[in-house]
């Protein structure tokens, strides 16, 4: 086989042009004040996370920060429950978003920007243990950002629980 042409694709980073950082820095918001997050389901610290049930509706108040979710182990969800994941990104750096996905979502994922709380609904259709994970590369330990939801049969007596941060 004869090679006809060998060159980088369009947008190859070596063709980038530099500009002075001062042109951008004055216009950038560098940190996000979590106190301005007015979402009623915002968990502004890991100690504010947890799970609650109201009939067939489960609310999970969750946080994400490099490189873990809290809680990252949830039990007692039942088949057919509407599970609302309310995820607050505790990052303060302007360029560290986190993603969230779990098997069976009606859309592919959720992207949560620093300081923001976003909500996604998941309805499990079968019994099992379902992994959730971060879909946006955030750090060298990105693959550690994962957790599990254990789904029990409808009417099960498995208590609704989630792990809490250790008191180190």
How should each PLM-predicted stretch be described?
Residues 1-3:
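Hydrophobic membrane-insertion alpha-helices, especially the h-region
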Residues 5-7, 11-24, 32-54, 112-168:
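Extracellular/periplasmic metallocenter environments
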Residues 50-82:
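N-terminal edge beta-strand
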Residues 62-64, 77, 87, 102, ...:
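Hydrophobic residues in beta-strands and at strand termini
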Residues 65-67, 82, 88-92, 105, ...:
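Solvent-exposed coil/turn segments that connect beta secondary-structure elements
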Residues 72-75, 107-111, 121:
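Beta-strand-rich interaction surfaces with strong enrichment in secreted/lumenal proteins
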Residues 82, 97-99, 129:
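Exposed beta-strand and adjacent loop surfaces of beta-rich binding modules
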Residues 86-116, 140-147:
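Histidine- and aromatic-enriched segments that form or immediately flank copper-ligand environments
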